[in-house]
């Protein structure tokens, strides 16, 4: 018989740098999960992706065990990294702060495809392109 899920916790953590300190400790502590064990497993599975924010969905079972699924990094993080910036524009409709090429947009869309609600690459490019536009980043051919 399958274990009964008692809670689902969603967190966005820096790859390879999860610690029992907030936000991980309080979020998992209230479900009775072994926080140190989660941090070790998360850091081991994300060691090759340092510098990125990797969202994780943790399923907590009634025997206080857990399993987790790693998601793809947020589109905004990938766009900022591709553009070589620290953050998006504070006024995206007025001040454009950088640009990415169509090829970079396509590679970001391919990365994000498993987590988007489409299987079509051109649709994924439109979704990611909209995120870039809302960050004040232009898309060049």
Curated annotation (Swiss-Prot):
Assembly description: Part of the ribosomal stalk of the 50S ribosomal subunit. Interacts with L10 and the large rRNA to form the base of the stalk. L10 forms an elongated spine to which L12 dimers bind in a sequential fashion forming a multimeric L10(L12)X complex.
Q: Note the coiled coil stretches, chain numbering.
A: none
Please report the organism this UniProt entry assigns to the protein: Porphyra purpurea (Red seaweed)
Record's protein name: Large ribosomal subunit protein uL11c
TM ranges are none
What's the encoding gene here?
Answer: rpl11
Q: Which CDD domains match?
A: Ribosomal_L11
Cellular component (GO) terms are: chloroplast; cytosolic large ribosomal subunit
Gene3D superfamilies according to UniProt: Ribosomal protein L11, C-terminal domain, Ribosomal protein L11/L12, N-terminal domain
The GO molecular function terms of this record are: large ribosomal subunit rRNA binding; structural constituent of ribosome
One matching Pfam family, short form? Ribosomal_L11_N
Which keywords does this chain's UniProt record carry? Chloroplast, Plastid, Ribonucleoprotein, Ribosomal protein, RNA-binding, rRNA-binding
Query: Which PROSITE patterns does the UniProt record give?
Result: RIBOSOMAL_L11 (PS00359)
Give GO terms for biological process: translation
């Amino acid at each position: 018989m399958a274990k009964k899920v008692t809670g689902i916790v969603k967190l966005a953590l820096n790859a390879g740098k999860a610690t029992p300190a907030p936000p991980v400790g309080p979020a998992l502590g209230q479900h009775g999960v072994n926080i140190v064990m989660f941090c070790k497993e998360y850091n081991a599975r994300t060691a090759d992706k340092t510098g990125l924010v990797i969202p994780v969905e943790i399923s907590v079972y009634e025997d206080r065990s857990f399993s987790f699924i790693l998601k793809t990094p947020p589109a905004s993080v990938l766009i900022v990294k591709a553009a070589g910036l620290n953050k998006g524009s504070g006024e995206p409709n007025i001040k454009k702060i950088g640009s990415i090429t169509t090829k970079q947009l396509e590679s970001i869309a391919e990365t994000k495809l498993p987590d988007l609600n489409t299987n079509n690459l051109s649709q994924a490019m439109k979704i990611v392109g909209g995120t870039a536009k809302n960050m004040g980043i232009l898309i060049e051919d």
